[in-house]
Amino acid sequence: MFSFIKWFSTLMENAKKKKGLWFTLLTIGSLMGIFASLYFVNFLVSDVAQKTYENQKNHYVLGFKNKIISQNEYTEALALALSKNEDIANDFFSSDENARKNIDKKSKEIENKINSVLGKKSLSISYEVGNNVKKGIGIDITKEGAVFKSSVPMIDKNGTITNVVVTKDIDTLIENYKKEDKAFAFLLTESSSHKIDRKLKKSAYTSYHDKFYIKSASYDKIFVDQLKSVDFGGILEENGFIKDSKYFYVYQKVYDLDGDFAGLAFVAEQVKDDNSFVNLVKNLVNSVTMVALGLIVSMLLFLF
Protein backbone atom coordinates (compact mmCIF):
# COMPACT_ATOMS: atom_id res chain seq x y z
CA MET A 1 0.00 0.00 0.00
CA PHE A 2 2.83 2.39 0.92
CA SER A 3 4.61 1.50 -2.33
CA PHE A 4 1.48 2.31 -4.35
CA ILE A 5 1.10 5.71 -2.65
CA LYS A 6 4.76 6.48 -3.30
CA TRP A 7 4.40 5.41 -6.94
CA PHE A 8 1.26 7.51 -7.41
CA SER A 9 2.93 10.57 -5.83
CA THR A 10 5.93 10.19 -8.12
CA LEU A 11 3.62 9.85 -11.13
CA MET A 12 1.76 13.05 -10.18
CA GLU A 13 5.02 14.97 -9.70
CA ASN A 14 6.30 13.85 -13.10
CA ALA A 15 2.95 14.67 -14.70
CA LYS A 16 2.97 18.19 -13.26
CA LYS A 17 6.35 18.79 -14.90
CA LYS A 18 4.76 17.93 -18.24
CA LYS A 19 1.96 20.44 -18.73
CA GLY A 20 0.22 18.56 -21.57
CA LEU A 21 0.17 15.24 -19.72
CA TRP A 22 -0.94 16.92 -16.51
CA PHE A 23 -3.94 18.64 -18.08
CA THR A 24 -4.84 15.45 -19.96
CA LEU A 25 -4.86 13.45 -16.72
CA LEU A 26 -6.74 16.24 -14.97
CA THR A 27 -9.42 16.31 -17.70
CA ILE A 28 -9.79 12.51 -17.81
CA GLY A 29 -9.94 12.29 -14.02
CA SER A 30 -12.51 15.08 -13.81
CA LEU A 31 -14.72 13.57 -16.50
CA MET A 32 -14.55 10.12 -14.93
CA GLY A 33 -15.43 11.60 -11.55
CA ILE A 34 -18.33 13.58 -12.99
CA PHE A 35 -19.80 10.61 -14.89
CA ALA A 36 -19.36 8.23 -11.95
CA SER A 37 -20.93 10.71 -9.55
CA LEU A 38 -23.78 11.49 -11.95
CA TYR A 39 -24.53 7.79 -12.35
CA PHE A 40 -24.63 7.35 -8.58
CA VAL A 41 -26.77 10.46 -8.03
CA ASN A 42 -29.14 9.51 -10.87
CA PHE A 43 -29.52 6.01 -9.40
CA LEU A 44 -30.38 7.42 -5.97
CA VAL A 45 -32.78 10.04 -7.33
CA SER A 46 -34.53 7.52 -9.61
CA ASP A 47 -34.94 5.17 -6.68
CA VAL A 48 -36.47 7.95 -4.58
CA ALA A 49 -38.82 8.89 -7.46
CA GLN A 50 -39.90 5.25 -7.87
CA LYS A 51 -40.62 4.95 -4.15
CA THR A 52 -42.59 8.21 -4.30
CA TYR A 53 -44.73 6.81 -7.12
CA GLU A 54 -45.22 3.59 -5.15
CA ASN A 55 -46.34 5.54 -2.07
CA GLN A 56 -48.77 7.56 -4.19
CA LYS A 57 -50.08 4.34 -5.72
CA ASN A 58 -50.66 2.86 -2.26
CA HIS A 59 -52.49 6.04 -1.26
CA TYR A 60 -54.79 5.76 -4.30
CA VAL A 61 -55.43 2.04 -3.72
CA LEU A 62 -56.28 2.66 -0.06
CA GLY A 63 -58.64 5.47 -1.08
CA PHE A 64 -60.38 3.19 -3.59
CA LYS A 65 -60.79 0.40 -1.03
CA ASN A 66 -62.22 2.87 1.50
CA LYS A 67 -64.74 4.05 -1.09
CA ILE A 68 -65.76 0.44 -1.74
CA ILE A 69 -66.25 -0.13 1.99
CA SER A 70 -68.32 3.05 2.25
CA GLN A 71 -70.56 2.07 -0.69
CA ASN A 72 -70.98 -1.48 0.62
CA GLU A 73 -71.94 -0.17 4.06
CA TYR A 74 -74.47 2.15 2.42
CA THR A 75 -76.21 -0.57 0.41
CA GLU A 76 -76.01 -3.06 3.30
CA ALA A 77 -77.59 -0.62 5.76
CA LEU A 78 -80.49 -0.02 3.38
CA ALA A 79 -80.95 -3.75 2.69
CA LEU A 80 -80.92 -4.54 6.43
CA ALA A 81 -83.44 -1.79 7.13
CA LEU A 82 -85.78 -3.17 4.47
CA SER A 83 -85.36 -6.77 5.64
CA LYS A 84 -86.37 -5.78 9.19
CA ASN A 85 -89.30 -3.62 8.14
CA GLU A 86 -92.40 -5.42 9.44
CA ASP A 87 -94.77 -3.84 6.93
CA ILE A 88 -92.64 -5.00 3.99
CA ALA A 89 -92.18 -8.47 5.53
CA ASN A 90 -95.91 -8.89 6.16
CA ASP A 91 -96.73 -7.74 2.63
CA PHE A 92 -94.09 -9.95 1.06
CA PHE A 93 -95.13 -13.15 2.83
CA SER A 94 -98.82 -12.41 2.43
CA SER A 95 -100.85 -14.42 -0.06
CA ASP A 96 -102.75 -11.25 -0.96
CA GLU A 97 -101.69 -10.14 -4.44
CA ASN A 98 -102.36 -6.49 -3.62
CA ALA A 99 -99.94 -6.73 -0.69
CA ARG A 100 -97.19 -7.92 -3.03
CA LYS A 101 -97.88 -5.00 -5.35
CA ASN A 102 -97.63 -2.71 -2.34
CA ILE A 103 -94.03 -3.88 -1.81
CA ASP A 104 -93.06 -2.85 -5.32
CA LYS A 105 -94.69 0.52 -4.77
CA LYS A 106 -92.85 1.13 -1.49
CA SER A 107 -89.55 -0.03 -2.97
CA LYS A 108 -89.99 2.23 -5.99
CA GLU A 109 -90.72 5.21 -3.72
CA ILE A 110 -87.52 4.57 -1.77
CA GLU A 111 -85.55 4.17 -5.02
CA ASN A 112 -86.89 7.42 -6.42
CA LYS A 113 -86.13 9.40 -3.26
CA ILE A 114 -82.53 8.16 -3.10
CA ASN A 115 -81.90 8.54 -6.84
CA SER A 116 -83.28 12.08 -6.77
CA VAL A 117 -80.64 12.91 -4.16
CA LEU A 118 -77.93 11.15 -6.18
CA GLY A 119 -78.99 13.04 -9.29
CA LYS A 120 -79.38 9.96 -11.48
CA LYS A 121 -80.84 6.46 -11.44
CA SER A 122 -78.04 4.41 -9.93
CA LEU A 123 -79.71 2.55 -7.04
CA SER A 124 -82.29 -0.22 -7.29
CA ILE A 125 -84.13 -2.52 -4.89
CA SER A 126 -85.28 -6.04 -5.74
CA TYR A 127 -86.11 -9.37 -4.09
CA GLU A 128 -84.79 -12.88 -4.69
CA VAL A 129 -86.79 -15.88 -3.52
CA GLY A 130 -85.44 -19.34 -2.75
CA ASN A 131 -84.18 -21.59 0.01
CA ASN A 132 -80.60 -21.45 -1.25
CA VAL A 133 -80.22 -17.68 -1.39
CA LYS A 134 -77.45 -16.37 0.83
CA LYS A 135 -76.13 -13.12 2.15
CA GLY A 136 -73.57 -11.37 -0.03
CA ILE A 137 -72.00 -7.92 0.08
CA GLY A 138 -69.50 -6.53 -2.42
CA ILE A 139 -68.98 -5.71 -6.07
CA ASP A 140 -70.89 -7.93 -8.47
CA ILE A 141 -71.71 -8.07 -12.18
CA THR A 142 -75.40 -8.06 -13.08
CA LYS A 143 -77.30 -7.60 -16.33
CA GLU A 144 -77.06 -3.83 -15.68
CA GLY A 145 -73.26 -3.96 -15.33
CA ALA A 146 -70.86 -3.62 -12.40
CA VAL A 147 -72.62 -2.71 -9.15
CA PHE A 148 -72.17 -2.52 -5.40
CA LYS A 149 -74.50 -5.25 -4.20
CA SER A 150 -75.90 -6.13 -0.78
CA SER A 151 -78.11 -9.19 -0.53
CA VAL A 152 -79.66 -9.65 2.94
CA PRO A 153 -82.01 -12.54 3.87
CA MET A 154 -85.52 -11.95 5.22
CA ILE A 155 -87.16 -15.02 6.81
CA ASP A 156 -90.77 -15.48 7.91
CA LYS A 157 -92.03 -17.66 10.77
CA ASN A 158 -92.43 -20.65 8.43
CA GLY A 159 -88.80 -20.46 7.32
CA THR A 160 -89.55 -19.07 3.88
CA ILE A 161 -86.54 -17.09 2.69
CA THR A 162 -86.26 -14.13 0.42
CA ASN A 163 -83.32 -11.85 -0.15
CA VAL A 164 -83.62 -8.10 -0.10
CA VAL A 165 -81.17 -6.96 -2.79
CA VAL A 166 -79.91 -3.39 -3.02
CA THR A 167 -77.57 -2.48 -5.88
CA LYS A 168 -75.80 0.75 -6.72
CA ASP A 169 -74.00 1.43 -10.00
CA ILE A 170 -70.21 1.46 -9.60
CA ASP A 171 -70.11 4.50 -11.88
CA THR A 172 -71.34 6.59 -8.93
CA LEU A 173 -67.64 6.75 -8.02
CA ILE A 174 -67.06 9.00 -11.04
CA GLU A 175 -68.52 12.02 -9.22
CA ASN A 176 -66.68 11.11 -6.01
CA TYR A 177 -63.34 11.19 -7.79
CA LYS A 178 -64.22 14.26 -9.85
CA LYS A 179 -64.47 16.21 -6.58
CA GLU A 180 -60.86 15.16 -5.91
CA ASP A 181 -59.82 16.29 -9.41
CA LYS A 182 -59.23 12.68 -10.46
CA ALA A 183 -60.69 10.43 -13.15
CA PHE A 184 -62.24 7.00 -12.54
CA ALA A 185 -63.08 4.14 -14.87
CA PHE A 186 -64.09 0.51 -14.44
CA LEU A 187 -63.20 -2.03 -17.12
CA LEU A 188 -65.01 -5.36 -17.20
CA THR A 189 -63.18 -8.53 -18.13
CA GLU A 190 -64.35 -10.21 -21.32
CA SER A 191 -65.79 -13.15 -19.34
CA SER A 192 -67.69 -10.88 -16.92
CA SER A 193 -69.17 -8.90 -19.80
CA HIS A 194 -71.27 -11.94 -20.78
CA LYS A 195 -73.43 -11.34 -17.69
CA ILE A 196 -74.56 -7.94 -19.01
CA ASP A 197 -77.80 -7.55 -20.95
CA ARG A 198 -76.88 -8.10 -24.62
CA LYS A 199 -78.66 -4.98 -25.89
CA LEU A 200 -77.04 -2.83 -23.21
CA LYS A 201 -73.62 -4.28 -23.95
CA LYS A 202 -73.97 -3.64 -27.67
CA SER A 203 -75.20 -0.06 -27.26
CA ALA A 204 -73.17 1.23 -24.31
CA TYR A 205 -69.93 -0.75 -24.07
CA THR A 206 -66.69 -0.51 -26.03
CA SER A 207 -64.12 -3.31 -26.38
CA TYR A 208 -60.57 -2.65 -25.16
CA HIS A 209 -57.82 -4.80 -26.70
CA ASP A 210 -60.33 -7.71 -26.91
CA LYS A 211 -59.79 -8.30 -23.18
CA PHE A 212 -61.95 -5.71 -21.44
CA TYR A 213 -65.15 -3.74 -21.90
CA ILE A 214 -65.93 -0.21 -20.74
CA LYS A 215 -69.19 1.72 -20.59
CA SER A 216 -67.61 4.52 -22.60
CA ALA A 217 -70.62 6.86 -22.48
CA SER A 218 -70.28 7.14 -18.70
CA TYR A 219 -66.75 8.51 -18.72
CA ASP A 220 -64.82 11.52 -19.98
CA LYS A 221 -64.05 10.94 -23.67
CA ILE A 222 -60.46 12.26 -23.46
CA PHE A 223 -59.74 9.95 -20.53
CA VAL A 224 -61.34 6.94 -22.24
CA ASP A 225 -59.39 7.54 -25.45
CA GLN A 226 -56.13 7.91 -23.53
CA LEU A 227 -56.81 4.66 -21.66
CA LYS A 228 -56.54 2.83 -24.98
CA SER A 229 -52.80 3.53 -24.99
CA VAL A 230 -52.32 1.54 -21.78
CA ASP A 231 -50.63 -1.84 -22.24
CA PHE A 232 -53.17 -4.13 -20.57
CA GLY A 233 -51.01 -7.13 -21.35
CA GLY A 234 -48.47 -5.83 -18.85
CA ILE A 235 -50.97 -5.69 -15.99
CA LEU A 236 -50.10 -8.73 -13.90
CA GLU A 237 -50.06 -7.53 -10.29
CA GLU A 238 -53.09 -7.02 -8.04
CA ASN A 239 -52.44 -3.30 -8.31
CA GLY A 240 -49.88 -1.00 -9.86
CA PHE A 241 -49.25 2.32 -11.56
CA ILE A 242 -48.63 3.46 -15.14
CA LYS A 243 -47.40 6.84 -16.40
CA ASP A 244 -47.78 8.49 -19.77
CA SER A 245 -47.64 12.06 -21.07
CA LYS A 246 -51.19 12.88 -19.93
CA TYR A 247 -52.07 10.77 -16.88
CA PHE A 248 -50.68 9.00 -13.84
CA TYR A 249 -52.83 5.85 -13.61
CA VAL A 250 -53.31 3.53 -10.66
CA TYR A 251 -55.17 0.26 -11.23
CA GLN A 252 -56.67 -2.28 -8.85
CA LYS A 253 -57.98 -5.71 -9.76
CA VAL A 254 -61.58 -6.25 -8.65
CA TYR A 255 -63.25 -9.58 -7.84
CA ASP A 256 -66.99 -10.35 -7.79
CA LEU A 257 -69.01 -12.09 -5.07
CA ASP A 258 -68.03 -15.50 -6.49
CA GLY A 259 -64.34 -14.62 -6.20
CA ASP A 260 -63.81 -14.36 -9.96
CA PHE A 261 -61.68 -11.64 -11.55
CA ALA A 262 -64.35 -9.16 -12.66
CA GLY A 263 -62.39 -6.19 -13.93
CA LEU A 264 -59.95 -3.36 -13.38
CA ALA A 265 -60.64 -0.14 -11.52
CA PHE A 266 -58.58 2.81 -12.75
CA VAL A 267 -57.99 6.03 -10.82
CA ALA A 268 -55.97 8.66 -12.65
CA GLU A 269 -54.56 12.13 -12.11
CA GLN A 270 -54.09 14.35 -15.13
CA VAL A 271 -50.62 15.73 -15.89
CA LYS A 272 -51.75 19.21 -16.85
CA ASP A 273 -49.61 21.78 -15.00
CA ASP A 274 -46.55 22.22 -12.80
CA ASN A 275 -48.62 21.54 -9.68
CA SER A 276 -49.60 18.03 -10.74
CA PHE A 277 -48.10 15.18 -8.76
CA VAL A 278 -46.09 13.72 -11.66
CA ASN A 279 -44.60 17.08 -12.66
CA LEU A 280 -43.69 17.89 -9.06
CA VAL A 281 -41.71 14.64 -8.84
CA LYS A 282 -40.12 15.27 -12.25
CA ASN A 283 -39.10 18.83 -11.32
CA LEU A 284 -37.74 17.63 -8.00
CA VAL A 285 -35.60 14.98 -9.72
CA ASN A 286 -34.26 17.50 -12.24
CA SER A 287 -33.49 20.07 -9.54
CA VAL A 288 -31.66 17.57 -7.33
CA THR A 289 -29.66 16.29 -10.31
CA MET A 290 -28.58 19.80 -11.36
CA VAL A 291 -27.61 20.80 -7.82
CA ALA A 292 -25.66 17.56 -7.38
CA LEU A 293 -23.89 18.12 -10.71
CA GLY A 294 -22.89 21.64 -9.67
CA LEU A 295 -21.51 20.42 -6.35
CA ILE A 296 -19.60 17.58 -8.00
CA VAL A 297 -17.97 19.87 -10.57
CA SER A 298 -17.07 22.40 -7.87
CA MET A 299 -15.50 19.73 -5.66
CA LEU A 300 -13.49 18.26 -8.53
CA LEU A 301 -12.16 21.67 -9.56
CA PHE A 302 -11.25 22.42 -5.96
CA LEU A 303 -9.39 19.12 -5.55
CA PHE A 304 -7.37 19.59 -8.70
What are these regions (language model features)?
Residues S3-W7, E13-D47, N286-L303:
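Extreme N-terminal signal-anchor transmembrane helix of membrane signaling/transducer proteins, especially
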Residues F2-W7, D260-S276:
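Juxtamembrane amphipathic/hinge helix adjacent to a transmembrane helix
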Residues M154-V164, Y255-A265:
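Short hydrophobic/glycine-rich mini-motifs in sensory/regulatory modules
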Residues Q270-A292:
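Membrane-interface helix-start motif
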Residues K19-K105, E109-L123:
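Juxtamembrane extracytoplasmic/periplasmic/luminal helical "stalk" adjacent to the first N-terminal
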Residues I103-L118, K134-G138, I155-S207, F277-N283:
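Solvent-exposed, extracytoplasmic
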Residues V117, G130-K135, K215-G240:
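Soluble sensory domains of the PAS superfamily and closely related sensory modules
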Residues E144-P153, D244-K253:
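A short beta-strand signature within small-molecule sensing/ligand-binding domains used
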